[in-house]
Amino acid sequence: MKVEVQFVDLDHSESMEAFANEKLGKLGRKYDWVIGANVFYKKEQHNNEENYLCEIRLSAPGPQLFAHEYDTNFEKATNQVIKQLDVQLEKRKAKMSDH
């Protein structure tokens, strides 16, 4: 699976890119029909609190899959997004096997 990681208004982080690649690599091994992923990291301010946003778009057969999450750091946000995408991929897999 091809993974592209972008940092919006942030400095590039090799460790976060490696973390995203590791997590998405696990999804890619579980669902070998996933073609690629676009990961976006962004830090935002809401009510004087820092919120860390992770968005991931997956390319796979059928409509594109998307999930995003805010959390107290990028690792937690990424883990939540991966869980959401795993659920979406399971549903897609079930639909694909029905045909």
Language-model-detected regions and their locations in the chain:
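N-terminal, polar/charged subdomain of small-to-medium soluble alpha/beta proteins
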Residues: 1-99
